Amino acid sequence: MQSHLELGEAEARLAIEACVAELRRRNKVGSIAVGDKHGELIALLRMDGASLPSSGIAANKVFTSSRLRQPSGALGRAALAEGWDVHYHGDIRYLGWDGGAPVFYREQCVGSVAVSGLTGVEDLEIAEIGVNAILATLD
């Protein structure tokens, strides 16, 4: 028998609150997405002033990170290094930009957090703050 864990609404709220707090601390705005282990959205927030495309990009980073169980930017780096298109995975939602971070709990990917609207480095830093906010409440 298999036991499956995945993020829910409560964890999504924690991650979004932590990411928003960090964005405000930096005087920045962006979009934050939290997805389940399949990469489907649980929650999405586009802060006032964030670019319109950032919400769709954050959602695609969540999809990529959860489905591949790795940071979203790893796909882009692999595609560049090996010379293939990220869409070879069969779904146009795969995205190779930094900013999506998987959440691992008990050796399982239970979902992911993504941020969009800043640089890739900043997006990933803030997404990881959301991941850590979730992990701090588990167990």
Predicted segments with their positions:
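Flexible, solvent-exposed loop/hinge segments and secondary-structure transition points
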Residues: 1-139
